[in-house]
Amino acid sequence: VADIDDRWYRRGPDGRREKTERHGQGARWLVRWRDPQGRQRKKSFKRKAEAESYAASLEHGLRSGSYIAPDAGRVSVGEWATRWLDGQAHLAPSTLARYRDVIETHIVPRWGSVHLSSITHADVQTWISGLVGRLASTSVAKVHRVFSLMLAWAVRDARLARNPAEGVRLPRPEQPEHRYLDHDQVAALAERCGDHGVVVRFLAYTGLRWGELAALTVGRVDLRRRRVLVAESVTEVGGRLVWGSPKTHERRSVPLPRFLAEELRPRVEGRRADALVFPSPRGDVLRVRNFRRRVFDAAVREVGPEGFHPHELRHTAASLAIASGADVKIVQQMLGHKTATMTLDLYGHLFPDRLNDIADRMDQIVCAPDVPRE
């Protein structure tokens, strides 16, 4: 239970109210309570109504288990960002690097010296609104997401009662304009890449991320079953190679078309299980920047599309799989998406509209002539 003391007046021996030696000095009302650890706490207020409101919220928090210590949020956003990043070791190195960049570029310049407890929802909304126009809507959403994740961590650590970034209005997301190659375009691009054409075909028909391709070893290619086990990824972060699990931290089995399995055979048969399937010319990890600079970008300039990136071959793989009749769950498994919803959000427009097919099929079943039984 929280107690409220009047620091300017007290009751004398005769029961009458009399002034204290602190009369007229500082805040008049003092709220006292014990926190869940039994420590004595106190906070001063100028007005009695403020003290009563604070005491009521304290008692509610103590009873409900949602109590937040007054000094818990007196940590600067800059310091909290460092702690939060240190606690995200489960993230992929590339994701962690992107989060760090967002924090250093956008969050710390605005919030670095601000205490967590001083952040208001209105201030966050004003800040986010100010980013609109300077950044693309997807970038604004990423900045907000990182900031909100940091503050959610503070809520779980009992430093904030709620997340002031929740409910902030974001700009309408721009629909990504994915580009997809057809089979002939894949063949043309692969041909222009010469000996590295197999890399283009592999990405276009398996949908692996570049880091998954670069980390693929011989022991994870089963030519008989025509399967590739995606279990590892390698990412270049700040010029350094960082090995880890795939983006969703889950292994997956990806099918190989027969022609691609045959093309991989010389790269797999008779080699050590831990050898890289797609090494660089020097025998180490094939880095995407080097691949683009030496091979891919020149081929793209010849056959297009303009500015095409190796990652867009992953979109191509989804498109070709869907055109071949794969359903959403197959595409999800192939690409390693965490949920089918994510797959539909990205590629739902590529799935054919089969509503009429379903109606026609039901019509055939219901209206089929009865066949007399013998």
Regions flagged by a language model, labelled:
Residues 1-89, 97-101, 105, 118, ...:
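Basic/aromatic DNA-contact patch characteristic of tyrosine site-specific recombinases
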Residues 23, 42-46, 73-78, 82-164, ...:
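N-terminal core-binding DNA-recognition domain of tyrosine site-specific recombinases/integrases
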Residues 25-26, 137-148, 156, 160-216, ...:
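Basic, Lys/Arg- and aromatic-enriched nucleic-acid-binding interface segment
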Residues 46-48, 68, 172, 180, ...:
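Catalytic-site neighborhood detector that most strongly recognizes the C-terminal catalytic loop/helix
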Residues 62-63, 111, 155, 203-204:
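Alpha-helix C-terminal capping/helix-coil junction sites
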Residues 137, 187-197, 206, 254, ...:
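Short, basic (Lys/Arg/His-rich) helix/loop patches that form interaction surfaces
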Residues 165-167, 203, 225-233, 278, ...:
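Short functional hotspots where side chains directly engage DNA or cofactors
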Residues 220, 225, 234-260, 266, ...:
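C-terminal secondary-structure termini that scaffold catalytic or DNA-interacting sites
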